[in-house]
Amino acid sequence: MIPEKIRAEDGGDPERTEMKIAIGNDHTAVELKHIIVDLLEEKGHTVLNLGTDTEESCDYPVYGERVGRAVASGQADLGIAICGTGLGISLAANKVQGVRACVCSEPYTAVMSRRHNDANVLCFGARVVGSEMAKMIVEQWLDAEFEGGRHQRRVDLIMEIERRECGEE
């Protein structure tokens, strides 16, 4: 679960603790990654850049795994992973135990991924969303809080499946 670092929905908590956010991307998302890094740094977050900075073709699973491992290990509080559609990089991130990566192409889904699924990695596609939409998605995702309650039970069930599949039960 994410520490109490996320701003309240009512516009924000001025005493908010800033976070360390891992970001990874493939060659399709270099420009968008830099836009998101700038946004995160403007908001006072520390950014761990685990993506490529060149547009030379590369393999998105490498970067999804890097972001997932940074989050799962506690090296980062949250992660953002960007490829062409957000789909492939999310599949790779979700292979890391403890990661709940969600693909979000608009703010509502981003908010709900945090509120109901306690998503710890946000994924989206550089070929799907423009820079302004991407910034809105990131801001809304960071501002949302996990609601717990019945949603905690459901997240626990998801994590139970993961433990079984990893041979821990």
Give the ranges of each region predicted by the language model.
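Short, Lys/Arg-enriched N-terminal segments with co-localized hydrophobic residues
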Residues: 5-18
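Glycine-rich phosphate/diphosphate-binding loop of Rossmann-like nucleotide-binding domains
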Residues: 22-42
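C-terminal binding/interaction regions
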Residues: 22-24, 28-29, 107-169
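Alpha-helical segments flanking ligand/cofactor-binding loops in enzyme cores
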Residues: 38, 65, 69, 91, ...
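A short beta-strand-loop structural module common to alpha/beta enzyme folds
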Residues: 46-57
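Helix-adjacent hinge/juxtasegments
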Residues: 63-103
